[in-house]
A protein has these predicted regions:
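Juxtamembrane regions of bacterial inner-membrane/periplasmic proteins
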Residues: 1-2, 11-19, 26-369
Length: 369
């Protein structure tokens, strides 16, 4: 970490209380850490101002409504630590979406010009041995893409991707690619199997789902491993524009791009792109190739159970491929497929009779050559 620090700390002690009036700013902040970004992160300006109060007798520390500024984006910060536990809250109101790009430093935002705001509040608390409580709430307010930089995605475009083996993948998404499937030709039960499994709020959110973010971070804290919590739109952003590394800034870039994509493209076009660029098995891109790879049939012939299976492997096309290689699916996995089908039935995307017929069906892969 490097940068130029300026400011003051005034300390006042009264009995067992120690209060510190703090106003610290850092210009030209440089941070190198693999969890932050794959390259050194540079922030033009950071400022923290507020009062921190410590009670030596009670062994407590708190700061309320302190002010923070990150590159011109302002918010408030509160925190408390005592013998009952620890908590903090960050509140950022009405940040212009056009300002967010200044924090991420990436060529994929060339030509980025956006209108609208975002409100965001992050809270965390943990008392004793209880599970930590984490929440992310917010709202994207009237997002509007001013530039036309993503309009090319409304037409057939060339998809370029580097797979997990660092091999380039390139194909046209649209007419000119015989494997391309227009959304209207994907059965509703396949479409909704993926939506309820990957992003149930797809048609309601504006690219990002704050509730799912909270659930993902809570899982990450509890299980001490990464779970993305990405919407379908975020997954599109990641596949179209970003590197594969897992860093905080890559996730932040993904969020900004998802908001931009949602404001630029129709939900129908987003789904059409998604179904045609997703990797469903090692080296198997697009729903058409996936249908032939797993079941030896065209997309329109897929059953609800087969659609549920395709939805279930999206999070791990390499990790879950052993089932196809073994030629069978475990009972536990079948239970998961039935859960997806049940959600589809309860949400009106599968009739009760279709649900009953589907849970009776045996999942059969195509014979391997």
């Amino acid at each position: 970490i490097s940068g130029t620090v300026d400011g003051f700390i005034n300390i006042l002690r009264k009995s067992t209380d120690i209060s510190a009036d703090i106003d610290i700013s850092v210009k030209g902040l440089n941070i190198e850490h693999p969890l932050i970004d794959w390259q050194p992160y540079k922030l033009s300006f950071f400022r923290f101002s507020g009062v921190a109060v410590a009670d030596i007798g009670k062994k407590s520390l708190k700061s309320e409504n302190s002010k923070i500024s990150l590159g011109g984006i302002d918010g408030s910060f509160s925190a408390k630590k005592d013998d009952t536990g620890v908590s903090f809250a960050v509140d950022i109101n009405k940040v212009p979406l056009n300002k967010l790009e200044t924090l991420v430093h990436n060529d994929v935002f060339k030509g980025y010009l956006f209108d609208g705001d975002i409100d965001l509040k992050v809270t965390y608390s943990k008392e004793g041995d209880a599970e930590p409580v984490f929440s992310v709430t917010g709202e994207v307010v009237e997002p509007l893409q001013i530039s036309d930089r993503l309009n090319y995605l409304k037409e057939p475009f060339l998809f370029n991707f580097i797979d997990r083996n660092d091999q380039p993948v390139s194909f046209v998404v649209g007419e000119g690619n015989r494997d391309f499937i227009a959304l209207d030709y994907i059965p509703e039960h396949v479409l909704w199997a993926v939506i309820v499994s990957e992003d149930a709020g797809f048609f309601m959110h504006k690219g990002i789902d704050f509730e799912e973010m909270s659930a993902a971070v809570k899982d990450n804290i509890k299980k001490k491993k990464m779970r993305g919590g990405s919407t379908i739109t975020q997954q599109i952003a990641k596949n179209l524009f970003l590197k594969r590394e897992r860093t905080l800034l890559r996730k932040f870039r993904e969020v900004i791009l998802a908001i931009e994509l949602d404001a630029t493209l129709s939900k129908k076009r987003l789904l059409e792109i998604y179904f045609n660029i997703v990797e469903w098995a090692p080296g198997i891109f697009g729903i058409s190739n996936a249908a032939w790879y797993y079941f030896g049939k065209p997309v329109y012939m897929l059953t609800p159970l087969e659609g549920a299976y395709l939805a279930s492997v999206i999070p791990g096309p390499y990790r879950y491929n052993y089932q196809f290689q073994n030629g069978k699916v475990s009972e536990k996995w079948i239970e998961n497929l039935h859960r997806i089908l049940n959600i589809m039935n309860e949400t009106g995307h599968l009739t009760f009779q279709e649900y009953i017929d589907s849970v009776k069906e045996e999942l059969l892969f195509r014979p391997k050559e």
